[in-house]
Amino acid sequence: MDFHRALSALFTNQAAVQPLLGSLGFPFNDGTSILTTALAAQSGGKKLDTPLGILPFDSLPTTNLLTPTKKIKLEDELCASPVSSRSSTVSSSHFSSPQRSPSRKMSVPIPEEKKDSAYFERRRKNNDAAKRSRDARRQKEEQIASKAHALERENMQLRGKVSSLEQEAAQLRFLLFSKISPANSEVSCESNDSTETNDSNDSKSDSTIEV
């Protein structure tokens, strides 16, 4: 059943439709006028108006929608607020700028009228303290240099001892090998003599057997 037939069936039975619309809480007072308008529009081939006040998406007002330009403006306004600018400056200064070391104050020349005895006494104490500091630093550097010289000299002595011990070990090794080699030659000579005597005894025994 198409839409035209459904509307015509509802329009013909208005007495039954009216209490149903009232029981459902239909927002319009006159249900027959809605049905009549819908039926006339459907029969004429016109586009139906929305009877319940529901607007299509295209006809909705676009004031509440965020367009790209409005979004950019909103972000600019948020960035321009004092709280965000303060937090951004604090964060940027905390992460980007390195921590500066405390710089020394520029020396300001003291006028002649202020150079009294207390000033000269303070200058003398400062000069004495600076001299003591220089002397202590120089003494410490001299101690380090003398200690390094003593360690280098001890290192050279130890290297000389190591080389002399290596030479002595080489000489002892040579003497050990030279003592082992004559003993081996004597053992070989004794073995040769024993083999010769055995051969001579064997030849004598053979000659006696032949006689």
From Swiss-Prot:
List the GO molecular function terms: DNA-binding transcription factor activity, RNA polymerase II-specific; identical protein binding; protein heterodimerization activity; RNA polymerase II cis-regulatory region sequence-specific DNA binding; RNA polymerase II transcription regulatory region sequence-specific DNA binding; sequence-specific double-stranded DNA binding
PROSITE patterns documented for this protein: BZIP
Q: Name one Pfam family in it.
A: bZIP_2
Q: Which domain of life is it from?
A: Eukaryota
Q: Show the InterPro entries listed in the entry.
A: bZIP, bZIP_sf, PAR_bZIP
Record keywords, A-Z: Apoptosis, DNA-binding, Nucleus, Repressor, Transcription, Transcription regulation
Gene Ontology BP term (one): regulation of transcription by RNA polymerase II
GO cellular component terms, alphabetically, are:
nucleus
For the region Disordered, give the residue spans: 83-152, 184-211
Name the residue ranges with Low complexity bias: 83-101, 190-200
Compartments where located: Nucleus
List the biased-composition ranges (Basic and acidic residues).
Answer: 111-152, 201-211
Segments forming domain bZIP: 116-179
Knockout or disruption consequences: RNAi-mediated knockdown causes morphological defects in excretory duct cells. Reduces expression of transcription factor lin-48.
Spans annotated as Basic motif: 122-140
Cited SMART domains = BRLZ
Q: Where is this region: Leucine-zipper?
A: 144-172
Assembly and partners are described as: Interacts with NFIL3 transcription factor homolog atf-2.
Q: What does this protein do?
A: Transcription factor. Required to activate programmed cell death in the sister cells of the serotoninergic neurosecretory motor (NSM) neurons. Negatively regulates the activity of ces-1 which in turn negatively regulates the activities of cell-killing genes. Binds to the DNA sequence 5'-RTTACGTAAY-3'. Involved in the development of the excretory duct cell, by positively modulating embryonic transcription of putative transcription factor lin-48, acting in concert with NFIL3 transcription factor homolog atf-2.
Q: Which family does it belong to?
A: Belongs to the bZIP family.
- From the Swiss-Prot or TrEMBL record, give the protein name: Transcription factor ces-2
Organism listed in the record? Caenorhabditis elegans
